[in-house]
From Swiss-Prot:
PANTHER family, alphabetized: FASTING-INDUCIBLE INTEGRAL MEMBRANE PROTEIN TM6P1-RELATED, MODULATOR OF MACROAUTOPHAGY TMEM150B
Topology within the bilayer: Multi-pass membrane protein
Function field: Modulator of macroautophagy that causes accumulation of autophagosomes under basal conditions and enhances autophagic flux. Represses cell death and promotes long-term clonogenic survival of cells grown in the absence of glucose in a macroautophagy-independent manner. May have some role in extracellular matrix engulfment or growth factor receptor recycling, both of which can modulate cell survival.
Main subcellular location: membrane
Keywords per UniProt: Autophagy, Cell membrane, Cytoplasmic vesicle, Endosome, Glycoprotein, Membrane, Transmembrane, Transmembrane helix
Sugar-modified residues: 34
Source organism, top-level taxon: Eukaryota
GO BP term, example: autophagy
Cell location: Cell membrane; Endosome membrane; Cytoplasmic vesicle, Autophagosome membrane
Phylogenetic lineage: Eukaryota, Metazoa, Chordata, Craniata, Vertebrata
Any Pfam family the entry gives: Frag1
The protein's name: Modulator of macroautophagy TMEM150B
Family: Belongs to the DRAM/TMEM150 family.
InterPro entries reported in the protein's UniProt record: DRAM/TMEM150_Autophagy_Mod, Frag1/DRAM/Sfk1
Originating organism: Bos taurus (Bovine)
Length: 235
């Protein structure tokens, strides 16, 4: 039986995918974008109200959920014996991805282009680095637990490769003024990133609790003993 924490990545993926396409639908209905002129970038769909308000809310909640997932993953990898420096690099790339997602949602492209593009870089390119680092870790440390079916690892490799190729294609095609094709690459890359976050549900399938513990001082009670199916996050 899967623990309830596995619902968090799945909910994030569903929330983000459904939310982004809702923004797209509203932009089309409200004529904020014209599909006859070409397929729009995600940011263009969320440029003006009311869809810009929904866009911000969707990405803010998604960013907060992603940050919490990255923190849980950090402590899970720590309990599996991953080196601290490697684990911290993975954590910070994930948190930067979450930060970039929030920046994209709150700084619309038409108002703060430079800030918006910085957030997009963090969300897309640093985000895919987060998953590449975890793939490298699972390949390098064969003794790490590998929850889920044997095909989960190859699936992640395919998704990471496709996402990275699409992100590079997005930038190159944009520079060649092939905006519509570039936008399609952006949409597909975003969906793949959401799916990669959703696949972390497999890694969280063995977790059934998460306990926050204060650092014990002299004479204070010690935190409860570790359990293989629980995380103890020290503050």
């Amino acid at each position: 039986m899967w623990g309830y924490l596995s619902l968090l990545p799945m909910c994030l993926a569903f929330w983000a995918i459904a939310g982004i396409w809702t923004v797209f639908s509203l932009a089309v209905v409200n004529k904020a974008v014209n599909l006859t002129d070409g397929f729009p970038y995600i940011s263009v769909c969320g440029n003006v109200p009311p869809q810009s308000c929904i866009f911000s809310q969707v990405l803010n909640i998604g960013a907060a959920s992603a940050a919490w997932i990255c923190i849980l993953r950090y402590y899970q990898l720590r309990d599996w014996g991953v080196r601290k420096w490697h684990n911290q690099v993975i954590l910070w790339t994930g948190l930067l991805c979450a930060l970039g997602t929030s920046i994209v949602g709150n700084f619309q492209e038409k108002n703060q282009r430079a800030t918006h593009l910085t957030g997009a870089f963090l969300a897309f390119f640093v985000g895919i680095v987060y998953f590449w680092l975890q793939l490298f870790l699972s390949w390098r440390m064969k003794n790490l637990p590998q929850p889920g079916a044997p095909w989960i690892g190859p699936l992640r490799l395919v998704l990471c490769s496709a996402c990275f190729i699409l992100e590079v294609a997005m930038v190159v095609l944009h520079s060649w003024s092939m905006r519509s094709v570039s936008a399609i690459c952006e949409w597909v890359a975003a969906m793949l990133l959401f799916i990669l976050f959703g696949l972390l549900a497999v890694d969280f399938s063995r977790l059934d609790s998460c306990t926050l513990c204060l650092q014990p001082g002299s004479g204070s009670l010690r935190p409860p003993p570790d359990s293989p199916t629980s995380l103890h996050v020290q503050l």
